[in-house]
UniProtKB/Swiss-Prot annotation:
Keywords: Cell wall, S-layer, Secreted, Signal. Induction: Constitutively expressed. The level of slaA transcription is much higher than slaB. The keyword Secreted applies. One of its GO terms (cellular component) is extracellular region. The gene is slaA. Residues 1-30 form the signal peptide. Its main location: secreted. This is S-layer protein A. S-layer large protein. May form the highly ordered outer sheath.
Amino acid sequence: MDLSTKKVISAGLVFIYALSLAMLVPMFLASNQGVISAVINPATGGNCLPGRYSGIVQASGVTLPAVNLSYVAPFTSALPLLVYSQSIFNGTLYYYNSTGSYELMKKYGISITPVHQIVNVTSRFFARTTEGVIPNTLPPYTSGNCYLFNTTPPTPFYYSYRTLAMVNSYFPNTQYINTSSEISDLYFNVSYLPYNTTLTLSIYATPALQGIEGIIRFNFSVKLCANSTIYPYAEYTLHAYFYFNNSFICELENIKTSIPGVASATSPTTIHFTSTAVNYILLVDLGLWSNVSTVYVTGVEGATYPSDTVATTINNGSFHPVIIPPAICIQYKTFYSNQINPELPNTSGPDSIPYMIANVTIYSPDDMLNWTYAQKYVGCIAAEYANPKWNPYCKINEAWYNNYGHGGNGLTVTLMVGNNKVLSINYPYLALCHVSYTDGFHNFVYKFSIEFLLSSVDNITYMLTTVAPNSTGLGGDMLYVLIKPCQLKDATILLTYNDSDYAVQHYFGPVDREIAVVCNNIKVYTPLLYMPKCVPISTPFFYGQVIDYDYGYNYALVGYVNTYYFNATSHQYYKVGQYVDVQHVSGDSELVLGVCPGYKCASLSIYYPNTPPYYPASHEAKVGKIMGICIEFANGTMERIYLSPSNITALLTTNVMKQMAPMPPFWNYSFEISITGLESILHITPNQALTVLNNSYIIVCYYDIASNSTVHNMTKLVSTPVTVAISPPSQAFYYAPATPFDDIVHPGCQIFYFVNVNATYPITVTLTDKSLGELSPTTIVTTTVTCIYVILYNGTMLHYNSAVFPITLTETAPSSGVFTATLYVEVTNSKGTPVTAYPLNYSYIAIYNPATKMQIIVGKLSNIMPLVPSKYFKVGVVVDGLSANSTFTLTEIPNVIYNVSPIIYNYIDGELSVTVAANIPGYYYSGYLVLTIYNCTAKPCHPIYTYEIYFNFSATSPHFVAAYDLLFLEPILNGHTYYITITAIVVPLTYEPFTTIGFEGKVFSGAYFFSAPAGS
C-alpha cells in the first residue's frame, strides 16, 4: 500500500469518527404530542438554577415520569488521567542468522508514563442522564403539568469526549528512554526487535476525579515483522498494528534501510465512560457545569419508564447553571443617641452605636447539600416546615479538595487581639433561613449570631438551635465569643467562610473567591456613669446607672423581619417592609460588688446567670472598680467612705447591681445609694441630715477595664426647696395723736374724750419644706418658729426666740410639705392691753397667735418712732434657717374730723353751722368742735372769742352737724371779715404729765365774711 492510499484511508477515518462524535450530541426521539414549554427556577421565575437544586419543568399535552438531562459545554477542557498499571507481553526471543556471523537480538522493551502519574487529555465533553421527577402541586406553578427535577441528580451519567489532537506514537532511535506526556503524544521506546514477534501492551488509566468508579482500559497490540530478502543486508519492511478499544486503528509504517528504524503515524480518538458516584464533581471538572454551560431538558413520555421503549418529547427546554461565590453580611441593631446618653437627642446618626450582638448572614446559594430543602411539604404557610426532608441543621463541614489547595471546610471563626491570633475554631453548623417568601419555594441563606461575653478566659463556643429558624428570619445558632475585658477594645472577630460547593472551589478557587472573609470589630466606648443632679435628703435612696456597651446575656438578633401583604386574588404574600430588631431570649446579667484591700475601692464583676458551654465555672468576670465614694459638705469639707462590706451594704443597699429590664439598650446596670445608710455611716439623725447634708455632694468614681478609662459623677443633696412666706395685712396701721385743751369754762380741768380704734391685724406664715413633710408620709408633721424679730424704721432690730413664744406651724395634710400658722400684730399700751380708749401715742406692738398670746412690748412709739407720717416697722420670722418678713406702715391721721359742707352763717339768728365727718369711719369718736374768732383777717393776731360744741360719731352715724349760736356777737360780726378756725379736739381717757397728747383736727381755718342784711 502506497503512502497516498494510506493518507486517503486516514482522512476517511477522521471523517467517520467526526461523524460518530457528532451523533453523540443529545438527539431526542420525536413525539407527536408532548412538548416542553418552560424550565423555571421556582424562587426567581428565571431559568438560571444552582446545582443540587429543585427546578420545575413545565410540559403540555403529556405526562412525564422522567426527564433527560443533557449537559453541553461550549469550551474544551483538560481531562487528567491517572495511570494505575501497565503490562507487556513478552514474545519469544529469536536469533538472527546471517552468513558468516551470528548476532543475538536483544530483548525488546516498551516504556510508558510511570504508574500513578497524571497525563492530561484536552477535549470537549458531553454528558447525559435520565432522572425521575416529582409532580409539583404547589402554587404558583400549577397550570399545566409541572414537575420538580434535580438539576444535578446523583444517578449514573454517560460521558463521552473526543481528542482534538491526533494520537501520535513515536519510536525514537534511543535506548529505553522513560518519558511522559499527554496521551495524544505517548512515547514508545524500542530497541533491536526480532523478526516475527507480536508485542501486546496494556495500559490501565482513569480520570483523576472522585466521581469515577473503576478504571478505563487501554489495549495496544503491536506486531513487528522484519524479512531478509538478499544478502548482504537489503531493505526491511516494518508493519505495526495498534488496537484501542477496538475502535482506534493506527497503521504505523515506515521503510528504513536498517534496524532499528524510526516510524510514526496519527489518528483521532473518541472515549466513552460511565460515572456512578459524585457526578456533580465530574460535571464541574469536565466543564459541563459552569456559568456558560447549557443543560437541555427533554421529557420522557409514558408510564413505562424506565423501559427502553419510551418516547421523548418533540422538543426540549433548557436552563443555565449558575455558580456564585459566597458572601458574608453582618447586620447590627443600633441604638438611638439618647439611649447612649440621655442628654443626646433621640435620633440615629454618628452618636448611635450597635449592640454587642451581630447577626451574620452567609449567602452561599451553591452550598446547599440537598435539593429538597427548597421544597415545602404541603404548601401551607402555617405548616411550612412540615417537610419531612427538611433539616435546617445539616452539617456543612464536608470538605472538598481540589488542585488549588482550598478545601470547603465551612466557617472558621478566629479571635484576633491586635495582630495576634488568640484562638480559632471551625463552626460546623449553620442554620438555613429563607430570605424571600412565596407559597412554594424559598431562597436560603445561612444564619447565625455572634455575641460577645466578658469572661476571665478567652474562648469561642456555640450553642446549637438557640432559636429555631422560622418565617420571620429569626433563628440560627448562637456563637459566643468569651473575651477578657482588657482585650475587648483591640479585639477583632475574623469570619472565614470556605464554600464547600465543588463548582465554587473549581472556578473561583484560583482567584481566591471561594472564600468570604469579613471582620467584626467591637468599638469600645468610655462608659457613662449616670447620677441625678439633685435629690432631696428626705428621699430614702436614689438610683444611679453604669451605662456602657451592651455586654448583656443571651440576645437573638432578627436579621430581616418581614412584613407581608396577602393578595387574595393571586394567593401570594408580598413583602412590604423589613426592619432589624433584637429579642431578649432569657437571663439578665448582674454586677457583683466585691471588696478590695484597704477598703478604698470595690471591684465589679459581671455575672451571667445562664452561661453558654465552656464558660468559666465562676460565671463572672471582673469588669471595673468603684474607685471611691466621697461626701463633699457644703463648707467644702471632703470625707471618703471606706467601702467595707458593712458600708457597701448600708450605702449601696445591696452588693448586686441588677441589669435593667426588660431589654436594656446597653450594659446598663442600676445601683441604689441609700441616704438613710449614709446617715447611719455619718452617725446623724434624719432631722440633723436636713441641715448637715443640705447642699452637700455624693461623688462616685468608676474605673472601666474595657476602655481603660475613669469616669465620675455627683449628686447634690438638698432639703428640697424650702420657702417661708409672710402674707402682710391688707391695710396699714393708723395712729391719731391728741393735744391737751383747757376748758374755757373751767380752766385747768382736763376734758376727756373717747376714740375707739381696732388695731389688730393677722399675718399668715407659710413654710414649704417637702423633705420635712416626707419624714412621716402618713401623719401630719408640725414645726416651730425659730425666731420672731421686729425691725424698726431706723434699722433697730429686736429678736425674740421660740422659748418666749412657741408658735407652731402645722402641716396642711400628710406629706404635703406645706406648714402654716397665723400671727397677729396689735397696737397696745404700756400695760400690754389692746388700745381701746387709751392714748394712741402710747401704743405698743403685741405678736401672738390664737393659741398663745404673746405680747411684745417694744417701747413707746413716741420715743422710738417719732409721731410723723409714713413711718414703718417690719415683723419677721425665722424657720429652718430661712427668714421672711412683712412691712407695716404707720400712717398719721391728718384730721380726725373734716367738714363735708361749707360753713354757713345766718345773720338773722346769728347761727354758724357746718357738717363734719370722721376721717376714718367705722369707729366711735367723741369730743368738742372748737370755733375760734380772731380780731383780724389773717394771722398772727389774737383770738377774741372761743365757742365749743360737743360731738360724737359712731360706726352707724359717721356725720355730725355743728351749729354755733353767735347772735350775741351779731353787732360786731355782721358785715365784717374775721379769721376763724374750727378745730376738733379729741382728748384721751387718761393723761400722763409732761406728754403732749392733744391734737387739733382742723375742720376749717381762714378768713370768713359774716354776711349782713342789705343796707345795714
